[in-house]
Each structure stands twice: as C-alpha cells, then as structure tokens.
Amino acid sequence: MSEERRKMLADYGAELVLTPAAEGMGGAVAAAKRIVKERGGFFADQFGNPSSVKAHFETTAPEIFSALPSVKAIVAGVGSGGTAIGIKKYIVAHGLDCKVFALEPAESPLMSEGRAGAHLIQGIGANFIPALVDTKAFDGILTVRGEDAVREVGALFRTYGIECGISSAAAVLGARALRKDTDGDILAILPDRADRYPSSLYH
C-alpha cells in the first residue's frame, strides 16, 4: 500500500493494520476476519460481496453503452472482479456484441497461468482468485508488466494530461494490445488516480 493511501485512510480516522507484503491481499483479508472475530465489526468482503457485481451491472455498464454504443471490447483490471464481471453480465443479459477482457499483472498471472507472484500494480492481482470471479466468463485475459504500467502513468500524463494510477495505465496498455484484432472501439476502465501513488511512481 502506497504512503499516500495510508495517509488518506489515517486522515479519515482509520486505524491502519498493516500485513506483510509477501502475504498479498490474502493476508489482509485474513487479518480483517481476525479483527472482526476478536473485536467485533463488519466485514465488507470486497472480494466476495455480490453488491459489487450488482453495482457495475446497474450503473457502470449502462453508462458505458449509453456513452459509447459502438464499443466492441472492454478492458478491466481484476481486483475484486466486480467491475469486469458486472459489465460482462450486463452484456450477456442485453445480448450486446462486445467482449470483456480481464487484466492481471504479468508477474502474477494467476487467472491465465495459475501462478501468483509479487508485482507493482496496486489494486489488481490479489494473488488469489476472488469468489466473484468466473474466469470462463471473460473473452480473454490480458497481462501487463508492472514496470510498463508505471512508465505508462507518466506517458499518459505528458501526452494526454490524464493523471491516472498504475492499474489504470495497465488497462490502457491492455487496450492497445487489442487494437490489431478488434474491429471497433475499445474501452479501458481507469479506476484510480495518480495522486494515490507518487511514492510508488517516483522512487
């Protein structure tokens, strides 16, 4: 977790409980469950809460197809999986001609190759397949190297004035990789901003 994310949470009054980076998001989930058991509380279950899929089915997907009905391919990074699965369910439910491609770090290609590893793309690649995710639902799984995504953050800002985060830049790279094989518009989901990651980007 970047220093900026930690500060933002602390500013909101949150008590930060940090887990070893080597444990990945699985370690954070286990710690959250332990806190609920020992101290009481509510476990939102980001990786297994069907409300995430429902939200993207009811809001994100309709917005996409209202604004860009010509879209033929959508690239979404998979953290909890709610975005990609929610959009795909909407496409199927409405019989739309559009493919959904999941994106994961090349250093941790768990969905595509079955192996997990450390990587630089915060927000995706939890090093376990979330309960919300059915990998067979996707039309393809793309991978992007962390170093390439970090570089792309700067390139997007300098070229287009887009100040996005690392997973957003990775989605753009994934979308570019589809250009030769896609006849129509390609949309990349950009879910985060660069101001959450300066310490991770400029070291």
Question: Where do the language-model regions lie?
Answer:
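A short glycine/serine-rich beta->alpha loop
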Residues: K72-A73, F157-E163
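Short glycine/threonine-rich catalytic loop with a Thr-x-Gly-x-Asp
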Residues: A44, Y160-A169
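Short, conserved catalytic or adaptor-binding loops enriched in Gly and charged residues
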Residues: M8, K33-K37, I129-K136
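A structural micro-motif
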Residues: A14, R39-G41, C98, G184
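A glycine-rich helix N-cap at a beta->alpha junction
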Residues: M1-I35
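Glycine-rich phosphate/pyrophosphate-binding loop at beta-loop-alpha junctions
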Residues: G26, G48-T143, D148-A149, A177-H203
